[in-house]
């Protein structure tokens, strides 16, 4: 969870690089967005969703092992690719799943769900990080990402609702 990054970098005595982490994260999202859009539009949601989950998982594993600035920034870039792939893909899937007259409702529901999940995850993962530490917590986030990839496969792809493909 991005919520804990400032606290984790402080614990690692890398807090002076927290802003740089978020800068790299944001720049990678912006730079990769056109490529992600192209992949989604020309190859369907699977071309962005599965790699997005993989990049997220790899990024959090790397982040859990950070000991210095290079790995901190590498993990920021990899997490940026993952987030930059998943966020627009799921927003597009939400909109494509609704009738055109309900696109606004689908968009607001997507963002409402995102906000709720971020808030709940922060609460649960706060307990995990207090009990077992940040590296373990980021391992849990990686495992959760992998499990959500499976949920996507079984609930979306298998349901035949392959929007945009």
Q: Which residues are covered by each model-predicted region?
A:
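Transmembrane alpha-helical segments of major facilitator superfamily
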Residues: 20-29, 114
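Helix-to-loop junctions at the C-terminal end of transmembrane segments
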Residues: 32-44, 129-130
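A membrane-interface helix-boundary motif in multi-pass transporters
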Residues: 127-145
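Loop-to-transmembrane helix entry/capping segments in MFS-fold secondary transporters
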Residues: 15-16, 100-110
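Helix-loop junctions at membrane interfaces in 12-TM secondary transporters
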Residues: 64-75
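Helix-loop boundary and gating motifs at the non-cytosolic
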Residues: 1-8, 12-14
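Structural signature of the two symmetry-related core transmembrane helices
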Residues: 47-62, 142
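Intracellular juxtamembrane helix-capping segments at the cytosolic ends
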Residues: 85-98
């Amino acid at each position: 969870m991005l919520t804990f990054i400032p606290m984790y970098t402080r614990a690692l005595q890398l807090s002076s690089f927290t802003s740089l982490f978020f800068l790299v994260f944001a720049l990678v999202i912006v730079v990769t967005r056109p490529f992600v859009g192209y992949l989604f539009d020309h190859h369907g949601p699977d071309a962005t969703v599965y790699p997005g989950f993989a990049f997220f998982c790899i990024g959090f594993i790397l982040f859990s092992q950070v000991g210095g600035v290079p790995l901190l920034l590498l993990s920021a870039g990899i997490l940026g690719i993952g987030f930059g792939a998943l966020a627009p893909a799921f927003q597009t899937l939400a909109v494509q799943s609704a009738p055109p007259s309900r696109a606004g409702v689908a968009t607001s529901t997507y963002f409402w769900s995102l906000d709720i999940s971020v808030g709940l995850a922060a609460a649960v993962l706060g307990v995990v990080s207090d009990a077992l530490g940040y590296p373990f917590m980021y391992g849990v986030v990686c495992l959760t990402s992998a499990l959500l990839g499976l949920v996507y496969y079984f609930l979306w792809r298998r349901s035949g609702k392959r929007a945009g493909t």
